[in-house]
Amino acid sequence: KLNQKYQIVWATGPKQFDIVKEELKKSSIDIEKVPNAKILPYIYNMEEIMNISDIIVARSGAMTITEISNLGKPSILIPLPNVSQDHQLRNAEVLQKIGAAQIILNNELEKDILNKEIIEIASNKAKMKEMGEKASTKSVKNVQEKIYAEIKKIVKGGK
């Protein structure tokens, strides 16, 4: 459904790439022939891909949440289950609570649910904009300058 209207870039991770492609073939989906869809083992220019994306569908590790916030993007987050202290769910909830993200739990993830969430957000430009603006409120501005200032203090013997 989505591939006709939206461009999809899917990074599986190197270990899962062949497995995912094989599972898609078993489901009669030849991803190589799907227009506007690209499946990759890894994305080396993630910030660039995220920057040109309208909606980000991703796991919710700390770096991903930071990138989403810094770029001011609406997102659908699928926390990785069984991680230390359930930190990915807690990360995702930070954006969900302010209306910047939707969460789909891994055990509830089905194509129809994901389709519905993507279409619901993408079909409402005002909602997309609002979610992006809310995400950017969690962005830490001037991080490099702040880190540099702290390092200078430490080097000079200050606290």
Language model: regions and residue ranges:
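Hydrophobic alpha-helical packing elements
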Residues: 49, 110-114, 131, 143-147
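A donor-sugar binding/catalytic signature common to diverse glycosyltransferases
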Residues: 46-85
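C-terminal alpha-helical cap of glycosyltransferases
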Residues: 141-159
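Donor-nucleotide binding loops and adjacent catalytic segments primarily
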Residues: 1-55, 89-93, 97, 104-113
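Two-component system phosphotransfer/interaction surface
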Residues: 110-123, 152
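A short, well-ordered alpha-helix in the C-terminal region of glycosyltransferases
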Residues: 120, 127-141
